[in-house]
Amino acid sequence: MTHTGYAVYLPARVPGMAHGYAQTGSGLTDISDQPQIANPSGGAYSTTGDLLKFAEALAGHTLLTPAMTTTILTPRVSSPQPGGPGVDEYTYGFAYQQINGVTVVGHNGGTPGYEGQLDIYPSTGYVAVVLTNQDNTMIPAIQRTEALLTGS
């Protein structure tokens, strides 16, 4: 994973990093020069390739032992969402849900101008990585991906 790190101050200074955009009254505004240190992501960034490597290492037990992987991915807390599919359960660091009978284990996050989601489909071996560089654009891509991979 050579393209993953933290850009806590100015993401625009990370070589090759996409600029982040936010919707404002005058259209899209490049906000890549805004510090990320106080945001929920902590300035973390990655690429689809690096996140795929992470998921493959986790599933292939090269990141953790099989027992530890099971511990990390076993649901711990139920959290049904009224009125929608939502998150069924949480594991250690991942959301665990059933979509059309297919198990999906994933994690998402974002900060102004950037959003991302990593979903692992254990029963099929599929991994879906969605990264965007514009606020509020990730959900349609995730819904299309889920529909393709779960038949929903």
Regions found by a protein language model. Give the residues of each.
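Catalytic loop of the DD-peptidase/beta-lactamase superfamily, centered on the K-T-G motif
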Residues: 11, 23-25, 29-152
